[in-house]
Amino acid sequence: MLARWILAGLALGLSLGNLAHADTRNVRILGRAAVIAGGGVKLQWAASGFEARVVGKSLTATIVDEWGDNWLNIEVDGKRSAIQLKAGTADYVIFSGKPGVHTVRVTRRTNSQGGATQLLDVRSDGSITPTAVPKRRMLVIGDSITSGYGVEGADQHCRYSKETQNADAAYPSLVARSFAADLELVSMDGWGLYRNYMGSPPTMKQMAWQTLPTDATPWPIGKSFPQVIIIALGANDFASGDPGDGFTADYQSLIEKLRVAHKNAHIFGVFGGILDGERYAAGRTAISTTIAKLKKAGDSRVHFIEFTLPNAPRRWGCDWHPGLDAQQRMARTLQTEIDQYVAW
């Protein structure tokens, strides 16, 4: 049985239906995706992918990876594994096991800079149908911390590698899973809102609204309807010192634009996890002050969260990024704050 990937409605978590053949089975896309001319979808954001209900004993996917730099996380009935993709087009056995009803989830483990991944089709000996669309939805706009950069590294002294990145082990994915919520993760390693850690614009000021990093087509963000929005930016902006009023102006503008698009969403501005000293203090002040200003002006659904992380085993991953325990601690902090403000 062949299921072609056709994006219906371009809405987060909406099932994909074949508009030409009524008997074609469906899958549900996770995160942002772009339609490929001739069939299929293109993914590039970390943690994006698909989920399906398979009645059968196997599932195979035809995938095109741009450079062979990406890994996928695979979850079948709660059991997790990972595969490294090859450059070019190849067929991958997602699972092969006992006949029955299986829930299959496939997501990008690696970052946006690893190039695009095209999902052309999936095949099964049985049927493929979309899983149910969760009512709870989260949008996270972030950087390397939210995409799980180096999270599985031994300590802060290891150098980053694709093998040590795992978006599913980063706090956005952990929180979304804890609330059974869909996650729309928009993150770029090394990118800031006002300025990037290295390199020239564009920044997340532009990227936050795009379908993919390499596809400037505006994402129809008004169709996503997240109840919770996390802005996890600032570390790269303040990495080389205080960027000044340009950052605070862009931060306020981002919140205001998100508020227009999502009038009832709770917006959380988070900070912490990687910087220290004056850089940390400047970033914390800029973000908390901006949020306090908006709250005073009448937006009661905007909140500031500070991640405080004590030194402990697995505090650090590669290149001084948060490790496994740090990501889990950030997830618990965010869960507590969401519980306080959101009726989930």
Identify the role of each PLM range.
Residues 6-17:
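Bacterial N-terminal signal peptides
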Residues 55, 263-267:
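Short, surface-exposed connector motifs at secondary-structure boundaries
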Residues 128-131, 214-225, 256-262, 296, ...:
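Surface-exposed acidic, glycine-flexible loop patches that form ligand/cofactor-binding
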Residues 45-48, 56, 88, 105-116, ...:
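Conserved SGNH/GDSL esterase-like catalytic core that processes O-acyl groups on lipids
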Residues 2-3, 17-141, 145-167, 342:
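N-terminal secretory targeting modules
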Residues 146, 180, 184, 234, ...:
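Sec-exported extracytoplasmic/periplasmic mature domains
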